[in-house]
Structure formats: structure tokens, C-alpha cells
Amino acid sequence: MEKIYFTLVGEHLCFEHSVLEKGMELTLVKKPNELDPETIEVVVSEGLGKIGYVANSVYTRKGTSYSAGRLIDKIEDNASAVIEYVLDRGAICSVCV
């Protein structure tokens, strides 16, 4: 299995204070819509629900991490992921495909 990194963004829009922790388990859920058919929602099942999205812009993704557009065809409708690094705004996470 290959480990792919992606940037989690939008967490600050869902919560006033950061809830992200290294090692936190996440679920990726494909949520295409008419504005962005490559939308991938990031969910925590520990009572928090949606905490953000996979970055889909060169302006929001960090380093060499995958954008939602590159990742969407590599995962099922739901996929497990984990936070690797917590940043000021968001996190770098990994998913095994």
C-alpha cells in the first residue's frame, strides 16, 4: 500500500479553537457538488463530525501533498486517514491507497 499525503483545510471555519492532534484518526468522504465535483470532506467520528476538507488549490495545499483533484480517484467513497503534522491552519494528513 502507498501512503499519500494531503492537506486538511477549513478546520478553523468549523471550530473556534483547533481540535487537531497528531495521530487523530479521520474519515475522508467524497461529497461532489455542482461548484466543486472533487470535494472531499474530512470527518472525525469522535462526536465532532465534519472538521474540514482536503485542499484543492495550489494556494491552500502545503508542500508536495496531494490536492483533492489528484486524490479523489485513488480512494473509495469513504477512506481512513490520520493526521501526521498539525499546522497553524490545518494539517498534513496521510491516507493509504
Where are these regions (language model features)?
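Conserved active-site motif detector
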Residues: 1-97
